[in-house]
Amino acid sequence: MFIDKAKVFIKSGKGGDGAISFRREKYVPLGGPNGGDGGDGGDIILQVDTGITTLLDFKYKKKFIAEDGENGGASKCYGRAGQDLIIKVPMGTIIREEESNKVIVDLSKKGQEFVLVRGGRGGKGNTKFATATRQAPHYAEPGMPGEELSIVLELKLLADVGLLGFPNVGKSTLLSMTTKATPKIANYHFTTLKPNLGVVAIDGIEPFVMADIPGIIEGAAEGVGLGIQFLKHIERTRLLVHIVDISGIEGREPFEDFVKINEELKKYSVKLWDRPQIVVANKSDLLYDDEVFEEFERKVKELGFAKVYKMSAATRDGVDEVIKEAARMLKEIPVKELEISEDEMYIPEEKRFTYVIDIEKDDEYNTYVISGTFVDRLLSAVNIHDADSLRYFHKVLKNKGIMNELREMGIEDGDVVRLNDFEFEYLL
């Protein structure tokens, strides 16, 4: 089964909590703090694996969570860092942020790695909070939470040449004749339902990758059939081989087919429409009158194309000429990275974890309510039953400007300040 799009949820590991611990040994009455730091959470890393050709694995697994860091321990023991989670993807995978649909990274190189989300930092143990005036801190820092992200993986095949044309014009036959690929071939429409890749390796030319794209029909750019899914797979090709059934045995007019396909390309992407094309009139062995080819060639040249190649993939007549021309043109066409504008790029916030502080006044009870991620993190680090810890708590509120903001809001002596389930009276 060929899967070229998948949605998954990823989360890096949480940092381990710092430890609150004190040295307790015989004959050491004032051992002091010795709580160790927590370990960092595991990252999630994307890695290109050339042995994978589809996103099938992501059909069955939708959630990826890295390992949390271990908590710190006594005797200044540091927690073990969480193990990184490596997710292997096919070459040519584009990663998008689901909500905005913006591109995070284009994984188009062999062995390429990208750290998608970083693990939370481990919290500091109480050893790190000891000072000359605060020698026995009864608090430690909790680990930072892991980062969460919902992403879309989108596979776009990496091929030098894309075979383009209506269904049943001979694209798969040409691929099978010139590579070791074994696409399904039959005399009916949409025999090919997934892209096929093959390496063209013929004496005298430099090898290149050719892709057989499932047949495109009128309205493909608007999604008729599986049009958009098929069209996106030729976005990365440097050269298009546009194959037309010149025999007309199915009742279609060859030149009309040629024009319709190019119109679909233009609707989907002007850049794709402007890509170099080799025009091939296939099934020439079934042609009853050479004037049909000559008329087709004349009309195509009027559109600005230099040459039309007459070919019969079934008898291999003219195949080598087409392949050699493709190899020659590829030497002149530079390899380009996928162009992504700034507007299309997903730029994460500089601070992956931001402190949110929200202060509201409840006039009925003269209570000031402080909430947000900052409060959750601060309270998890403070021992409210320890005087030294409460002094640290007050210092943090002051340094963060919260006490000044409370005064600006009109707080008075005796008013209540609430942080989650913890309350205290404000004293001037």
From Swiss-Prot:
Its main location: cytoplasm. GO terms for molecular function: GTP binding; GTPase activity; magnesium ion binding. Mg(2+) binds at S172, T192. GTP binds at residues 165-172, 190-194, 212-215, 282-285, 312-314. Residues 159-331 form the OBG-type G domain. One of its GO terms (biological process) is ribosome biogenesis. The keyword Nucleotide-binding applies. This is GTPase Obg. It comes from Clostridium botulinum (strain Eklund 17B / Type B). The lineage of its organism: Bacteria, Bacillati, Bacillota, Clostridia, Eubacteriales.
